[in-house]
């Protein structure tokens, strides 16, 4: 068990940038500090706890409550602080189960996971209630080193899974929550801002030139939010990722240095990708192509002058080819161009965003012209009291509608009228007693 002790201690508290403690300090710009307690240590050796269940049991079913009960009966008290926010609940409990192979059944205790203890106050640690816990296993730690420990602990901080069961790799190696790979990558900048407030990201709504800095620059522009006027609930984020030359470094597992762009869908609960819809999706060649291969998700997602990939997006709103699409398949019209060199710690690019004044306002307001197929019609509109009134005459019938509080409603639906020579310039629209 002495070798296990050295290995586990290195993964948690080691000097490497990718140890759990140092990783969290790096990605948070020293805003978050993790203090680990190991109550089973005796003379640089871990003293194992024998459980009341077998490895086969834990392979096939969820025995978390029994495992936790067995552990805390053995160690009901620990020395050191376990409740830094003083809410009466243990900040986080981690249990590592020993196993010989990766053959655990779905949702069993031997699948590495984060959960919340359901038992309330029926069991305590140093008189503190249990809440969030991580259940890990030696097989996954042996294969991914600190990465699986980090992944599950990030869940404890509120971060979602960014992978799914459809094998379309929505984020993959661009975030530790998208793929448990060693060495671990950074979490995406937007998630570090949204879930833990470790950085702030400026929002862009007008065309211009921007400069992005590397993720390790706490005072730089790690990312920008880019919004098009075409969608109030979805937007795109660009960030610059720099692949280090040394192996045991954060982001060593990404494919290349350069700019990535990803879509955020704020209508998805917790921004999770796990349940079929995508809160976060990284752009790749041929737009946001589903069912892409792992290599496509790795190599076709990054842009720089060195890679010969310097443009992203399509300004033709009627085209989807290589466009930055919303989740419903419509084109945002956003274009990133003249993406620069990734040779330094910053990169420059141009951003083009559709001008709201140039868009089809009727399409934006979802106006449904019931006479749109008529060969001859006269139509006019007027705005009054924050309402839009539309009058349309075709085949000696008058149709009037009103737009109010985001909805269209009918005033008259085909009233018979007698007209002579009517043109748009002679049709007069009056609102009386409104």
Range-by-range predicted roles:
Residues 1-9:
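Fold-level signature of zinc-dependent metallopeptidase catalytic domains
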Residues 15-126:
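Active-site-proximal segments of metallohydrolase catalytic domains
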Residues 21-26, 92-94, 98-253, 265-267:
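Extracellular hydrolytic enzyme modules, especially secreted metalloproteases
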Residues 234-236, 385-391, 433-434:
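Entry beta-strands of beta-propeller and related beta-repeat scaffolds
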Residues 381, 390-391, 400, 429:
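Hydrophobic strand positions within the blades of repeat-based beta-sheet folds
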């Amino acid at each position: 068990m002495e070798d296990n002790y050295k290995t586990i201690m290195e993964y948690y508290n080691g000097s490497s940038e990718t140890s759990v403690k140092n990783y969290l300090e790096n990605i948070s710009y020293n805003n978050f500090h993790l203090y680990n307690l190991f109550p089973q240590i005796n003379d640089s050796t871990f003293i194992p706890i024998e459980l009341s269940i077998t490895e086969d049991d834990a392979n096939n079913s969820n025995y978390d409550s029994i495992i936790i009960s067995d552990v805390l009966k053995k160690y009901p008290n620990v020395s050191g602080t376990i409740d830094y926010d003083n809410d009466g609940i243990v900040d986080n409990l981690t249990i590592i189960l020993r196993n010989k192979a990766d053959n655990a059944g779905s949702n069993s205790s031997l699948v590495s996971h984060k959960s919340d203890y359901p038992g309330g106050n029926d069991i305590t640690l140093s008189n503190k209630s249990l809440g969030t816990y991580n259940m890990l296993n030696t097989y996954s730690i042996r294969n991914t080193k600190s990465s699986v420990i980090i992944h599950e602990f990030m869940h404890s901080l509120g971060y979602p899974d960014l992978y799914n069961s459809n094998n379309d790799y929505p984020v993959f190696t661009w975030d530790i929550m998208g793929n448990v790979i060693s060495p671990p990558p950074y979490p995406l900048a937007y998630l570090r801002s949204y879930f833990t407030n470790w950085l702030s990201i400026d929002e862009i709504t007008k065309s211009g030139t921007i400069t992005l800095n590397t993720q390790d620059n706490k005072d730089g522009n790690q990312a920008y939010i880019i919004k098009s006027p075409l969608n109030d609930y979805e937007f795109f984020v660009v960030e610059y990722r720099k692949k280090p030359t040394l192996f045991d470094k954060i982001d060593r597992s990404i494919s290349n240095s350069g700019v990535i762009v990803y879509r955020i869908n704020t209508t998805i609960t917790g921004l999770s990708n796990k349940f079929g819809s995508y809160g976060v999706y990284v752009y790749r060649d041929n737009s946001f192509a589903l069912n892409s291969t792992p290599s496509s998700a790795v190599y076709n997602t990054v842009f720089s002058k060195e890679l010969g990939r310097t443009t992203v997006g399509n300004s033709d709103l009627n085209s989807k080819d290589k466009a930055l699409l919303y989740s419903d398949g419509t084109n945002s019209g956003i274009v990133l161009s003249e993406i620069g060199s990734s040779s330094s710690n910053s990169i420059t690019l141009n951003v083009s965003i559709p001008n709201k004044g140039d868009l089809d306002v009727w399409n934006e307001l979802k106006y449904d012209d019931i006479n749109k197929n008529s060969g001859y019609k006269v139509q006019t509109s007027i705005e009054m009291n924050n309402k839009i009134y539309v009058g349309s005459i075709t085949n000696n019938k008058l149709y009037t509608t009103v737009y109010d509080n985001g909805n269209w409603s009918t005033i008259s639906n085909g009233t018979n009228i007698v007209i002579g020579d009517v043109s748009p310039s002679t049709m007069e629209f009056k609102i009386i007693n409104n």
